[in-house]
């Protein structure tokens, strides 16, 4: 953990009615990032939320910087900016708090914390972004069950077994919509039961789609340095479903990929016994994540160069 103080009355509340604009930057296209943003909304109903993906363009960040002033407090949750980019905000706004759990971010955050008095951070690779954000503002005691399910899936533990799978299958439809996710943050036990029932049906349908993809689409091999990695063309919403089944079937770390314009997003998945790990492969391509679930992006040209001939 960095120098940020959580669950403390000294936290400045960045609401419009006290003249301070609060800005929240969160991980785009990610269920955990969306839940972290929903937690921000719960704490600060007037916060200005701005999503960024790991492939963000510098102009996207510049637009956010333009929206701030020297009284703004910026919370970056389940995400960290690229090297040299955080300074754009830190040097303009009143305060920046960065809450993240992606392994490639820790050293950058430590350096920023050392160099800037108005920057603080929370980092823990064993937790998820939403869980860390909740703990920062509200403490460990009353973490909502749905946040626990999201964390359980995001760091690929599945302590709650199928309940985790059912919950995230249902909640995935709200990814990218923190204002809708907020409705579920403090769901009652009865509401959670209904979510799990509906999520079970969705999960069964997803499993069928996964099986069709694995049956009808064969992986190709990528050469990543000295490693030959099977990669499967899989829609984003099924990346973990397909990735982990394929990794288990092939007995090695694999990746799924999607092509978006000139960018190819690779999601690496593996198991504890696999070497190299998902994280090690992602880091070769300047990506990051967790040991068994990590991601990186390459250009379309770089991707074709890596395809094993």
Task: Place the predicted regions along the sequence by residue.
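Active-site-proximal loop/helix segment associated with metal-binding centers of metalloenzymes
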Residues: 161-219
């Amino acid at each position: 953990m960095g120098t940020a103080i959580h669950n403390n009355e000294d936290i400045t509340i960045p609401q419009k009615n006290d003249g301070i604009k609060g800005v929240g930057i969160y991980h785009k296209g990610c269920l955990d990032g969306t839940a972290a943003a929903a937690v921000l909304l719960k704490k600060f109903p007037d916060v200005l939320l701005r999503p960024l993906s790991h492939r963000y363009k510098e102009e996207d960040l510049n637009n956010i910087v333009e929206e701030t002033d020297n009284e703004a407090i910026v919370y970056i949750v389940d995400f960290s900016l690229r090297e040299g980019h955080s300074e754009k905000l830190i040097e303009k706004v009143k305060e920046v708090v960065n809450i993240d759990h992606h392994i490639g971010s820790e050293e950058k955050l430590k350096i920023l914390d050392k160099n800037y008095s108005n920057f603080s951070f929370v980092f823990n690779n064993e937790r998820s972004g939403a869980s860390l954000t909740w703990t920062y503002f509200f403490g460990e005691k009353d973490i909502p069950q749905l946040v626990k399910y999201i964390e359980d899936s995001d760091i690929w533990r599945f302590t709650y077994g199928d309940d985790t799978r059912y919950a995230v299958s249902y909640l995935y439809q709200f990814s990218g919509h923190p204002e809708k996710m907020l409705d579920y943050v403090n769901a009652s036990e009865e509401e959670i039961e209904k979510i799990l029932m509906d999520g079970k049906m969705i999960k069964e349908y997803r499993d069928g789609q996964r099986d069709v993809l694995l049956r009808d689409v064969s992986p190709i091999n990528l050469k990543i340095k000295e490693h030959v990695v099977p990669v499967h063309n899989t829609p984003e919403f099924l990346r973990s479903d397909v990735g982990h089944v394929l990794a288990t079937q092939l007995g090695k770390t694999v990746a799924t990929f999607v092509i978006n314009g000139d960018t190819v997003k690779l999601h690496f998945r593996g198991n504890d016994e696999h070497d190299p790990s998902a994280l090690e492969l992602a880091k070769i391509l300047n990506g990051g994540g967790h040991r068994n679930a990590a991601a990186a992006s390459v250009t379309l040209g770089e991707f074709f160069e890596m395809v094993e001939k």
